[in-house]
Swiss-Prot record:
GO terms for molecular function: small ribosomal subunit rRNA binding; structural constituent of ribosome. Binds together with bS18 to 16S ribosomal RNA. CDD domains: bS6. GO terms for cellular component: cytosolic small ribosomal subunit. It holds the Pfam family Ribosomal_S6. The lineage of its organism: Bacteria, Pseudomonadati, Pseudomonadota, Gammaproteobacteria, Vibrionales. Residues 104-147 have a biased composition (Basic and acidic residues). This is Small ribosomal subunit protein bS6. Belongs to the bacterial ribosomal protein bS6 family. One of its GO terms (biological process) is translation.
Amino acid sequence: MRHYEIVFMVHPDQSEQVAGMIERYTGSIKDSGGQIHRLEDWGRRQMAYPINKLHKAHYVLMNIEAEQSVVDELESTFRFNDAVIRNMIMRAKNAVTEPSPMMKAKEERFTKRDDREERSDRSEAPRAEAPAKAEAPAKAEDEAAAE
């Protein structure tokens, strides 16, 4: 069996169907004796250039180990599925299991956001209240009444 890296882009209007598509594709790979080493759903992203007047697409990355017949079946499935805008299947020398640079950047953004939320939670701690300045307007009213 050979190793492959597969990236496919799904029409943005069909984003809710991506989970089902991934399940079907992974099922066909596993049923034929293949393995999935890495599966990443990058979500809806801006494309580098418009394709079919679309500016965004839902991206999915898979690193698999499978027979050529399985890859041929996946390729024909991509070709006849109207929701798949583009796909790329590349043969790899070995299995890639570590997160892609896209996912590393996404994780860094989430950790930074979590840190910001944690700091904002600390800043919302109860503070000593400043004394009310209600006396100043009352003096002005008293002076106006005295005249």
